[in-house]
Amino acid sequence: YSSITEQLLERIAPLMSETPMVPIHGDCHMGNILWRDDIPHFVDFDDCMSGPPIQDLWMLLSGERADRTFQLSLILDAYQEFYDFDTSTLQLIEPLRTLRIMYHAAWIARRWQDPAFPLAFPTFDTVNYWSNHVLALREQLAMLDEPPLTYFG
């Protein structure tokens, strides 16, 4: 585990060091957007932080690469009506996804003594969980070599 995480962090750190940070939601996914009368309402602000705007936007993307590219185009077209978007930060999507995967496991580990956590994450302390987690990190290492999504806005 330490070997793969060290490899990932060595690859990711230089990319993040030059990235401008702004206030972001920090956990902006479809489950944290409630819709009423065709108006989105964002909830769950306990993870607000400073980060690159793409951190909030990539979590709204799903599906295969073509689907994500199309969704990204729609999101960035709308986003740029209010604020300029630095397309060079598209290269951060997979590094940020990797950090989120690592952070999620660390978050569970930090809270493991809370009686609710073993109930909510019953496989966390199993070999299977950690085998799958390491496999996901290895897949992310390969994804870091893939070209980023493109935006033609």
Regions found by a protein language model. Give the residues of each.
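Canonical protein kinase catalytic loop motif
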Residues: 24, 29-30, 34
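ATP/Mg2+ or Mg2+-diphosphate-binding catalytic cores
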Residues: 107-153
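All-alpha amphipathic helical-bundle segments outside canonical DNA-binding/catalytic cores
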Residues: 87-97
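Active-site activation/catalytic loop segments of kinase-like enzymes and analogous catalytic loops
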Residues: 53-85, 100-116
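Activation segment
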Residues: 47-49
